Amino acid sequence: FIKEKEEIVFSILPTATQYARNSFFAGLMPSEIAKKYPQYWKNEEDDGGKNLFEKELLEANLKRLGKSNLRWSYNKITNVAAGKKLVEQFHKLKENDMNFLVYNFVDMLSHARTEMEVIRELADDESAYRSLTISWLEHSPLLDVIKKASEEKMNLVITTDHGTIKVNQPVKIAGERNTNT
């Protein structure tokens, strides 16, 4: 692989997936999504999934940018079976001008790190957490997709909607849902 460019960027967006990923695909701030596309936006206090319309937000974004003529795909991988299916159907990705792939595992792992005792035991410190993440990647269908993209000389942009920070002494803060407004 050839790393052409690496840069660190920051944002004023809250890092919660609901805000970060929806904004990423929509190309809009959360308040703008709520105004322009209320059918795709759920507020914090609303029930139901908060990231169910990423594909629709992406499509609207491409249209706004004058790129609706592009052939593109959107895939959200939430388990190993879906990842393997994507690898099997890689030939279809080659036909597109752009492919957007959401891979949820590392996000799920970071949440599990605080919620599941077994993950806390496996990844007690930053070094162990990185090792666990690298081990997962080395054995995941995602690496197969990256290798196939490299073999096909496809351009690949890897990004994230937010990061994670290990806190040594976590404190749970409880309050009404509108405490911060």
Give the ranges of each region predicted by the language model.
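Feature captures the catalytic ectodomains and active-site-proximal regions of enzymes
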Residues: F1-T181
